[in-house]
Amino acid sequence: MATSQRKILVTSALPYANGPIHLGHMLEYIQTDIWSRYQKLRGHECHYICADDAHGTPIMLKAQQLGIAPEDMIAQVNKEHQQDFADFNVAFDNYHSTHSEENRLMASDIYLKLRDNGYIKSKSISQLFDPEKSMFLPDRFVKGTCPKCKSPDQYGDNCDSCGATYSPTELINPKSAVSGATPVMKDTEHFFFDLPAFEGMLKEWTRSGALQVEMANKLDEWFEQGLQQWDITRDAPYFGFEIPDAPGKYFYVWLDAPIGYMGSFKNLCAKRPELSFDEFWGKDSTAEVYHFIGKDIVYFHSLFWPAMLHGSGYRQPNSVYAHGYVTVNGAKMSKSKGTFIKARTYLDHLDPEYLRYYYAAKLSSRIDDLDLNLEDFAQRVNSDLVGKLVNLASRTAGFITKRFDGKLAKINDTTLTEAFLAKQDVIADFYESREYGKAMREIMALADIANGFVADAAPWQMVKHDDQQEAAHQVCSNALNLFRILVTYLKPVLPRLAQDVEAFFQLPLTWDALGQDLAGHEIAPFKAMMQRVELDKVNAMVADSKDNLQVTADAPKTAAPEKIAKASSVSSEPLVSDPISETINFDDFAKIDLRIARIVKAEHVADADKLLKLQLDIGGETRQVFAGIKSAYSPEDLEGKLTVMVANLAPRKMRFGMSEGMVLAAGPGGSDLWILEPHEGAQPGMRVK
C-alpha cells in the first residue's frame, strides 16, 4: 500500500450523446484512465467517473430527424459509448448520464443556492430567433463572422480561431445553422449567472497551481477583457432540465453538464454506501478532485465551473488538466482521407493496447497537439512492445518450462534488478505529473538493457552445454524478473497485457512487490501475448473510415498558397538557387516545436559517410539524433555547443538506430553547413519562438 493513502476523484469531460466516440475523443479517456490506474496501483482510493452529456438542441433536433424520442436516442448512444470505452480498457468506476434524477436534483440545488446568494440575475434580452423553425437559436446554432478577429464561420458563443467569447447577437452576418435563414431579433426573459462577482476569487484560484501555465496565461487575457454575466437559460422547445419556478425556461447545457460530475458521483455513492458525497464535494473536503479536459473547453471549466461551485457552497477542483487536439498523419482528421476514425472502426481492426501505448508515448503535461502518425504508430508498437518488451519473455520463458520444471532460479547477481528498481521513483513521478512520454522512454531504455543482457548471454547457446545449465537458468530467470518489473511499470498503460502476464507468472503485479524474490516460483507455459501491427490492417481501417463516418464540420478556410516572387536582384544568390517555398499559414508553423539543445556527445557512425550521432540535452531529457553534418564538423568541435532542434518530429528508424528529432543547419551541403547556435543566455529546453 502507499505510505499515505490519498482520496481522489478524477473525471474526463463528458462526451456528447449525439454521435460515436472517435480517436480524438479517446486521447482524453486513455490519458485519464492511465492516471487513475496508476493511482490505484500505488494503493490510493481513486474513483474515476464520467457520464454522457445528454442535453441540448443538437440532441433534440437529431432525435426529431430519426423520428424517435430524445430519451431513446441518448439511451442507445450511452450503451454504445460504454461499450467502446470498455473495449479500450477504460475502467470507469461509474459511467452515468446528465439526463438523470441525480443530476436534475444537483442542478436545481446549485441554481437555487446561487439564486438565494444573489448570484442569479434576471433580465429581458433580445435573442436571435429562427422565423422558419419558430425557435430561439442556441449559441452553437448561430454561425457567422467573429466580431473580434473577423474569422468566418464561427459559432455564436466563442471563436475557435482566437478563443474570444461573445454574445451571438455580436456575430457579423449571422445565419441559422438549423434552417439557413437569417435570424430575427426577439425579446425573451433570461437568467444570468453573475460571473464578474467572482473575479477576485477566480484570479486567485487560476494562479494557485490549479491550472497549467499555458491555461493560466490564457485566462489572464480573458480577465483583461473583463468577465461577463453568463446566460444560463434556454427557451422551449429544448431537451434538458426545466428551471425551478420558471415554466418554459431550461438550464443551458453548459450549466448541468459539469454538474454531471457530481451527479455521476451521487449515483456511485448510492451503489456504494461506504462512500460519502460530502467527503469529496463538501466545502471543507480534504479529498482531491481533478478534471481532465480538452483545450477547447478551458473557459467553462476554469471560470464558470469553479465560480458556480464557490457560489453554491461546494469545493473547487484541485486541478484542471487540459490536453491538445489529435491530428492524424500531421493533419486535421479527415473523412475523405479516412483519418477521421471511430473508436469502433479501430477496434474492428486493431488491438486497443497499441493505441493506449502510442498515446502514452507521445503525451506530456503540456497542451500541445498530438499527432497520430500511422506509419510511426505501427513502427513504434512493433519495435517497443513486440520487439523489446514481449520478446524478452518469449526468448527465455520456454527454457524455464522445458528444462527447469517451470521454476525460476534464485538470482545470484542482482545488479540489473537493482538498477531497474532504482528507476521506480522517476517513473512514478512521470506518471503523477502526466509526463507519460518520459515514463515510456525510461521504461523502454530499461527494456533495451534487458534485451542486451539476454543477447550477450545467449542462453540458447548455453543450454547446449551440460556445464552451463545453471548459468542458463540464471540468465532466463533474471530476464523474466526484469520483464515482470517492466510490465508492472506499464500496467496503467497496458492493463490487458498486464493481466496476461499475471496469468503467466501466476501472481498479481503490484508496485509494492516490484522487488519480490521469485526464487523457486513456478510460472505457467508462455503464450503469445501481442502480435505485430500489420500495415494491411491499418490500411483496412483507413479504408473503412472513408465510408462509414458522418460528415464533420468544415475546417476554417485559408487562403490558397502562392509562390513567392523571384528575387529582385541576382545578388541574392541563395534565393536564386534555392527559392523561398510556398507560403504556409501560422497554424501549420505553430505545430513545429523548436527547442534549444546542448550537444552532450557527438560521435562518428560506422559505415555512414555523412552522419554524426548526437546526444542532445533538451532540459532534463536526452534525445539521440543522426545529423548529416559529418563533412562540416568533427565530433570534438560540437560537444558542449548549443543548437536548435525540432523536438516534436516523429522518431525515425534508421539502420544505425532511432533518430529522435532534427538539428537545424544552414548552407548548401557538404562542408558548407553551419549549425544554428543561439546567443549566450539560452538554456537547453527553452522553446524557440
From Swiss-Prot:
Keywords (A to Z) from UniProt: Aminoacyl-tRNA synthetase, ATP-binding, Cytoplasm, Ligase, Metal-binding, Nucleotide-binding, Protein biosynthesis, RNA-binding, tRNA-binding, Zinc
Localisation per UniProt entry: Cytoplasm
The protein's Enzyme Commission number: 6.1.1.10
Listed cofactors: Zn(2+)
Any GO BP: methionyl-tRNA aminoacylation
Entry-linked NCBIfam families: metG (TIGR00398), metG_C_term (TIGR00399), PRK00133.1 (NF001100)
Family: Belongs to the class-I aminoacyl-tRNA synthetase family. MetG type 1 subfamily.
Name of the protein in its database record: Methionine--tRNA ligase
Gene: metG
